[in-house]
Amino acid sequence: AGEIKELDSDDAVDILSELSDEKKEKVISLIKDENITENIRELLNYDEDTAGGLMAKELISVNENWSVLKCLGEIRKQAKDITRVHSIYVLNKKEELIGRLSLKDLIISPSKKKIKQIYIPKVDYVNVNDSGEDVAKLMRKYDLEAIPVINDDRQLLGRITICLLYTSDAADDDTRV
């Protein structure tokens, strides 16, 4: 359980999905961090060949109403749990994905400026139920390193990175990114 909690959520689920239900529950029960166990349980519910089954929960998200200064502080906190930051996703008060944030724009903007004044409203995304093959095609088409995963209410659930697709069986060899 100690090693499992150190992994990204998608990697932990890949390992746990190989275990029997009984062993899986035993390992999960040994993890003391509720946030980690909640993420693992959520990911175990998705079919492994869907965007939900491919995604990792670790990502950076910010609120459109935050100032640049608050945003930088929150990003520092969130980034501690992420191996590699590909994108910064912008959410509204309903936790809906509304855009992405350029690191350059964030760095050069005055500290009191609001994120809603500098974010980029265009963002490609996939639905949690989209097939892994469709995700691979979209990422290849737009040359994306990462893509956010949303539910039917446009709420941000996770992200899929190019690395996840390379290591996944969800995309057929001929559609692999």
Positions of predicted regions on the chain:
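Hydrophobic packing positions in regular secondary-structure scaffolds
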Residues: A1-S168
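Single conserved hydrophobic/aromatic residue that forms the stacking wall/gate
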Residues: Y166-V177
